[in-house]
Amino acid sequence: MKRRKRGRGIVNADRISQLPEALIIQILSLLPTEVAVTTSVLSKQWQFLWKMLPKLNFDSLDQRHEFKTFSKNVKRALLSHKAPVLHSLHLIVHLHLCNSMNTAKLIGIAFACNLRKLVLEVDGGRFSIPESLYNCETLDTLELKYSILMDVPSSICLKSLRTLHLHYVDFKDNESALNLLSGCPNLENLVVHRYPFSSVKTYTIAVSSLKRLTIYTSSTVDPRAGYVINSPSLTYLKIVGQIGFCLIENVPELVEASMIVSSQIINKNLLESLTSVKRLFLEFSPLMIKFPAGSIFYQLVYLELLTHEAECLNLLTLMLNSSPKLQILKLLSPKYQSWKKDVVGKWNKPKIVPECLLFHLETFMWKGYEWKRNDETEVAKYILSNTNRLKRATFFSKPISSEERVKMVKNLNSVVRALNSCQLLIK
């Protein structure tokens, strides 16, 4: 019996070692890098497997009780790496545990490993990006976060870079910001979380290869700060937060746009520059922006509109009149309305039934529908009574009694056109 148990134990011990090396490496890559390194003591076969890991992750706080050992351990791991390509390196550096000089050296060593993706998070001081980064030929993805200052030379050349994320990163000056983007000739995806106290007031994004652009700004950003966007290949645009101005030029390929803006827009062309899109999400006060006269959203088939102010319903009228091919309409009301029920003014319904209602609208959804508000009821009934192709209308309201629900359904059903066989849902 004992021999059987011992034999069974030997079999169990050998099971992992009998797996293909590629699978073992894949398993090790799911572990924290420091844990994966310690597996080298398990057997001779495992002694070198960790050196083939495609991804390495290090956090200096994990070694905060071993002062000055972090940079040595990371350096040793990078110099021991044997795979032809290091697919990803994620460094979380606290400068009181690993100073700027050592951090710069680690980045330089990583580039010698044919690094494809670098994620660098810095805290505890201001870190200046080393010049070696600005001429890395293998880097495909770069994510820089927090206490980082970029002094970008005009000689920058990141020819392989396709994805760039900048989280609260600051630039030495306007020229550095321009140099960074001009030195990325194949950049396709850019995400910017703007540093609130940046020295760059006008952020110019002129990249001919750029396809996706996402911008986040906080309420503490200078209200005079803004953006100039000139990217002819852009297909997706999202802007969130407070901006002083936004000039969008030459974006003929734009397909989807999301504008969640909480401050006044100085320029007048914001919506006019979005007329080529097929999908559009709008969240801002209509009183803060001028609707482009005569502009038609010929390609628009999907529209989401946040109705957080009474005036938003009049923006809806303008959008319906200007979107002849609209197929899907979603209205989103905040959970708790900040404006009074008896608001001054009323909804200005279209003078002529919009073309999209007559020929194209198939799906209508309203989240946060206030069925007791006269203006919202008027909007809902107008859309239901004037659509010929509507297949489904869904209304999400706050919790109401069974009697109120029956009353609301009856009220809406009374105007649904029989010829469009619309499915009316109340949730």
From Swiss-Prot:
Q: Could you confirm whether the keyword Metal-binding appears in this record? A: no
**What InterPro entries does the database record attribute to this sequence?**
F-box-like_dom_sf, F-box_AtFBL13-like, F-box_dom, FBD, FBL13/AtMIF1-like, LRR_dom_sf, LRR_PRU1-like
Q: Which residues form the signal peptide?
A: none
* Residue ranges annotated for the F-box domain, each copy included: 13-61
Q: Where are the LRR repeats?
A: 67-93, 98-122, 141-168, 169-194, 213-241, 258-284
Q: Which residues form the FBD domain?
A: 346-396
Q: Which keywords, in A-to-Z order, does the entry hold?
A: Leucine-rich repeat, Repeat
Its recorded name reads Putative F-box/FBD/LRR-repeat protein At4g13965
* Organism of this sequence: Arabidopsis thaliana
Please name the taxonomic classification of the source.
Eukaryota, Viridiplantae, Streptophyta, Embryophyta, Tracheophyta
